Swiss-Prot record:
Heterooligomer composed of large and small subunits. Belongs to the XseA family. The keyword Oxidoreductase does not apply. The gene is xseA. One of its GO terms (cellular component) is cytoplasm. It comes from Koribacter versatilis (strain Ellin345). Its main location: cytoplasm. This is Exodeoxyribonuclease 7 large subunit. Keywords: Cytoplasm, Exonuclease, Hydrolase, Nuclease. Bidirectionally degrades single-stranded DNA into large acid-insoluble oligonucleotides, which are then degraded further into small acid-soluble oligonucleotides. Its EC number is 3.1.11.6. It is found in: Cytoplasm. It catalyses: Exonucleolytic cleavage in either 5'- to 3'- or 3'- to 5'-direction to yield nucleoside 5'-phosphates. NCBIfam families: xseA.
Length: 455
């Protein structure tokens, strides 16, 4: 008999609900997701692990507790910075339970740094990364052509920026050909559109220099020009790129990776096209340099000829040397006159072209004249270089002939000229007798001797 029967009472067994592990975890997960569907959590990143799938896994911790965080690829790719251990952040998402391990976690949809903004952190991170790869190195910078005939500009086709660039280019050199690649300079598609412009000019447009331009703005406004893809497009460009983004105080990743940074779009136009005065000054400087180099070379040959002419071993060769020296002087004079005429003609053609620009606004006609003038300038420069080379070769050949005729060159090989006491050149041992005094002329110095026995 049971205890309850002895007392005369009947006890019913308590009702028990027995859960399967899967069911209880699922129920708790659902309750958590209902109650904590949209929460903000701050903490320090630890155990950061990006997966090959693009998902991000890490923990947020404070002084005593950790919370697992997962951010799926669709949200992770929208981040403007790269999460890393030790970075304090604020995460937004829903609390859930990872059923496989019964582990509490936050499924993050948004992440931002505490303190400094995400864009600034992304800027510093990308700057450090590209600098470590050497993309900012000075030796990578390509020179900007002095007088480009064709310029590519990547910017918005509307607004003050493109007008400022065109106005400066027209004022400094109206014949330059400008191609504009229209691109958004702000917004989600801006970076890819600007990068497409850089690639287009490298493949199809045959331009000599590219200007990437945008007006000033906040770091958010200039975010497209801090894009890694755009930076690498500029770095791999075979055509020199000038970055003209923002105001003078604004710096972007494009500024660091470009071949030249201009403080403003207008300044970029001034840097890429020299004024007529600058061209004249450059031509004058080149003319002076060529003339100075020619004078130095001619002076060297004149000194060498004078030294050879004064040497006692030459004797009757002074007349031949004088004739050759006169020929050298004549060549030098004719070369100087030709050089002066070439540069005078070049300056005159540039003056005529400049006058036509000031009095006519026939852009197509002037462009043709500019192309013709440029071709003639190149032809004149090539002719001048060829003339200089031809004259220099001829002078060197004359000097070589003189050197070959010089007895000094023979003496320097170990031979000697022997003279008797009267200074007559001895060619036969029978010209002297025992006891006669003779003098041997060497390459450096003389030796006197007494004949012991002629043979």
């Amino acid at each position: 008999m049971s205890f309850s029967d002895q007392l005369g009472f009947t006890f019913s067994a308590p009702q028990r609900r027995i859960w399967q592990v899967r069911d209880i975890v699922s129920a708790v997960r659902a309750a958590l997701e209902r109650e904590y569907a949209d929460v903000w959590v701050e903490g320090e990143i630890s155990n950061f692990r990006p997966a090959d799938s693009g998902h991000l896994y890490f923990s947020l911790k404070d002084e005593s507790t950790q919370l697992r965080i997962v951010m799926f690829r669709s949200q992770a790719r929208l981040l403007k910075f790269r999460p890393e251990n030790g970075l304090k952040v604020i995460a937004r998402g829903k609390v859930t339970l990872y059923e496989g391990r019964g582990e509490l976690q936050l499924m993050a949809e948004y992440l931002e740094p505490q303190g400094a903004g995400a864009l600034q952190i992304a800027f510093e991170q990308l700057k450090a990364k590209l600098q470590a790869e050497g993309l900012f190195a000075r030796e990578r910078k390509k020179p900007i052509p002095a007088l480009p005939k064709k310029i590519g500009v990547v910017t918005s086709p509307r607004g003050a920026v493109i007008q400022d660039i065109l106005n400066v280019l027209r004022r400094r050199h109206n014949s330059v050909h400008v191609l504009i690649f229209p691109a958004q300079v702000q917004g989600e598609t801006a970076a890819s559109e600007v990068a497409s412009g850089v690639r287009y000019f490298n493949k199809a447009a045959n331009v000599e220099v590219i200007i990437v331009a945008r007006g000033g703005g906040s770091i958010e406004d200039l975010a497209a020009f801090n894009d890694e893809g755009l930076a690498r497009s500029i770095a791999t460009s075979t055509i020199p790129v000038i970055s003209a983004v923002g105001h003078e105080t604004d710096f972007t990743i494009c500024d660091f990776v470009a071949d030249l940074r201009a403080p403003t779009p207008s300044a970029a136009a001034e840097l890429v096209i020299r004024s007529k005065q600058e061209v004249d000054e450059r031509l004058t400087a080149l003319s002076t340099h060529l003339a100075r180099a020619l004078r130095v070379r001619l002076l060297e040959y004149e000194k060498k000829l004078d030294r050879l002419a004064r040497h006692g071993a030459f004797g009757g060769m002074q007349t031949a040397i004088a004739r050759r020296q006169q020929r050298v002087d004549d060549l030098a004079f004719r070369l100087s006159v030709a050089q002066t005429n070439v540069f005078r003609q070049l300056h005159r053609r540039l003056d005529v072209a400049s006058t036509r620009v000031r009095h006519h606004d026939l852009r197509s006609r002037f462009a043709a004249e500019h192309r013709e003038l440029s071709a003639r300038v190149e032809k004149l420069a090539a002719t001048l270089r060829a003339n200089l080379m031809r004259r220099r070769t001829r002078i060197e050949r004359l000097a070589g002939q003189l050197q070959g005729l010089s007895p000094i060159s023979i003496l320097e090989r170990g031979y000697a000229l022997v003279f008797d006491a009267e200074g007559r050149l001895l060619k036969d041992a029978r010209q002297v007798r025992e006891g006669n005094t003779i003098r041997a002329q060497l390459a450096l110095g003389q030796i006197s001797a007494v004949v012991k026995k002629p043979e």
